[in-house]
Swiss-Prot record:
The gene is rpoZ. One of its GO terms (cellular component) is DNA-directed RNA polymerase complex. Pfam families: RNA_pol_Rpb6. The lineage of its organism: Bacteria, Thermotogati, Deinococcota, Deinococci, Deinococcales. PANTHER family: DNA-DIRECTED RNA POLYMERASE SUBUNIT OMEGA. It catalyses: RNA(n) + a ribonucleoside 5'-triphosphate = RNA(n+1) + diphosphate. This is DNA-directed RNA polymerase subunit omega.
Length: 99
């Protein structure tokens, strides 16, 4: 990201540490399937979700502490998805053992 965006992001929080925590939480939300608030043409053309989270915060469409998505709900969804993946792997292994 450009330095001007970093300065803007730092002005939105009380410290660079809080900014890093907020950015990391938003990146985890995106990884868990949260929709991006950016229009398609403004989305980052990279898989780096931290960069995308920083861009979202820099646009002002998300504000620290108020409009970030429900973290607990997305964490629960992520845990459910992961458990389903593990169960599918176990079932596949059991099927191979039967053959």
């Amino acid at each position: 990201m450009a330095e001007k965006d970093i300065d803007k992001l730092l002005s939105m929080t009380d410290s660079k540490y809080r900014l890093s925590v907020v950015t990391a939480k938003r990146a985890l939300q995106l990884r868990s399937g949260a929709p991006s608030v950016l229009p398609v043409e403004q989305r980052v053309r990279t898989r780096n979700l931290v960069t995308q989270a920083m861009r979202e915060l820099a646009t002002g469409k998300l504000t620290v502490g108020t409009s970030l998505l429900d973290e607990q709900r997305f964490h629960q969804d992520y845990v459910r998805q992961r458990q389903a993946q593990i169960q599918a792997q176990l079932n596949a292994e059991r099927e191979r053992e039967r053959d």
